[in-house]
């Protein structure tokens, strides 16, 4: 039986003329949880919580800006003939996670250089929190009925009906047609990556490997899920941008892992350089 219940209202709360959307609440919750977990892990590894908070203060807005630039660049035809301010109308939708990651990585490189800390250590600390935030954030797409796949077959519908709760079936049924809940596929995949990264940390891998594993595993999932989506950005009208970027990230990350395993001695649990210097000084004083 086709699900025809009314979809979830995108507006969670209305206070006078002010509307607060579920999308914003979900994204904010994911971001706050990610920041909290990253700060706790930084503290455990000997970095100050203030350092991570300072990084987040720069990384979050820059990541959002890059996410928008990335989207506008590949959808420029939408904005070329329209009013110029539409380029900045982020509230109307149009951001891309790959753009956000690029912005975050650039911020981390510059931040690490200025604050004299290891870029790879920051990246390793942030990676599990980032993928968890992405897993949560996809539920914002669910409420908005966006970033979904194409229509499903009757056989797939019957299979989904046995396992998926009604609220997902209802929300993914748009104008009488049910679509692939690609938000759910990616959210579940991201949670599995999160668990995998937590397990990887326990084995004290080479510094940078947690982040690079995040980059590889997320890109693998994104490559296949992107093939189902109906709202993909395209390069030259024939190549799905996210799939091309995913392949590029996988190749580069594998090369980095191989290179760093041969040339780098620092491990995930090693104290940051500043702490090592302090420990050496304290040892000399004791002598």
From Swiss-Prot:
The chain crosses the membrane at residues 15-35, 55-75, 90-110, 117-137, 180-200, 238-258. Coiled coil: none annotated. One of its GO terms (cellular component) is plasma membrane. Pfam families: LGT (PF01790). Its EC number is 2.5.1.145. Pathway: Protein modification; lipoprotein biosynthesis (diacylglyceryl transfer). GO terms for biological process: lipoprotein biosynthetic process. It is an enzyme of class 2 (transferase). It is a multi-pass membrane protein. A 1,2-diacyl-sn-glycero-3-phospho-(1'-sn-glycerol) binds at residue 138. The keyword Metal-binding does not apply. It is found in: Cell membrane. GO terms for molecular function: phosphatidylglycerol-prolipoprotein diacylglyceryl transferase activity. Keywords: Cell membrane, Membrane, Transferase, Transmembrane, Transmembrane helix. Belongs to the Lgt family. Catalyzes the transfer of the diacylglyceryl group from phosphatidylglycerol to the sulfhydryl group of the N-terminal cysteine of a prolipoprotein, the first step in the formation of mature lipoproteins. This is Phosphatidylglycerol--prolipoprotein diacylglyceryl transferase.
């Amino acid at each position: 039986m086709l699900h025809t219940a009314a979809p979830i209202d995108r507006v969670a709360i209305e206070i006078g003329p002010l509307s607060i959307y579920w999308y914003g609440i979900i994204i904010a919750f994911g971001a706050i949880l990610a920041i909290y977990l990253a700060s706790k892990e930084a503290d455990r590894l000997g970095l100050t919580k203030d350092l991570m908070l300072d990084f987040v203060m720069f990384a979050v807005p820059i990541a959002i800006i890059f996410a928008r630039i990335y989207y506008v660049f590949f959808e420029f035809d939408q904005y070329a003939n329209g009013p110029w301010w539409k380029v900045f109308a982020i509230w109307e939708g149009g951001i891309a996670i790959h753009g956000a990651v690029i912005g975050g990585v650039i911020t981390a490189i510059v931040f690490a250089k200025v604050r004299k800390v290891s870029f790879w250590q920051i990246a390793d600390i942030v990676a599990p929190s980032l993928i968890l935030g992405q897993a949560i954030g996809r539920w914002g797409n669910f409420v908005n009925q966006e970033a979904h796949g194409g229509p499903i077959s009757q056989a797939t519908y019957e299979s989904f009906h046995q396992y998926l709760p009604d609220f997902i079936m209802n929300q993914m049924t748009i104008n009488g047609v049910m679509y692939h809940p690609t938000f759910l596929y990616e959210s579940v995949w991201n949670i599995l990556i999160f668990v995998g990264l937590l397990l990887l940390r326990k084995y004290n891998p080479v510094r940078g490997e947690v982040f690079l594993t995040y980059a590889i595993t997320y890109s693998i999932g994104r490559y296949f899920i992107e093939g189902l989506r109906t709202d993909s950005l395209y390069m030259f009208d024939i190549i799905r941008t996210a799939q091309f970027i995913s392949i590029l990230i996988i190749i580069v990350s594998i090369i980095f892992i191989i290179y760093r395993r041969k040339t780098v001695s620092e491990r995930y649990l090693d104290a940051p350089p500043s702490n090592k210097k302090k420990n050496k000084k304290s040892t000399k004083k004791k002598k």
